[in-house]
Amino acid sequence: MLNDFTGADKVYIACGSTDLRKGIDGLARLVQQQFELDPFTNTLFLFCGRRRDRIKGLYWEKDGFILLYKRLEQGAYQWPRSESEVKVLTPQQYRWLMEGLQIEQPKAHRPVTGLTTV
């Protein structure tokens, strides 16, 4: 479910590690107080533990929160380490993260704009 989550307008990741003992209220408070964002929007917020092998997702669904949890059996997420920062992800970056890749792919093909024929 988390790998192909498409219900949210935006996806934010909390960079660095988060204490995953926090539940819905603790994570929602973190979103509001530390990142100054509104958790009651159509947004998926992702948090990663210290070992980077598990993540939690917080999502508001019109009448209540959904708390998602995923633990990898092997490997680790390529999670940005800078503390107290939140980043918005593009759909492509979200797919990369769920596939175990870094969200910043310097060698990825960039979209071409302003084409003309010769």
How would you describe each model-predicted region?
Residues M1-V118:
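Polybasic/polar functional segments that serve as interface/processing modules
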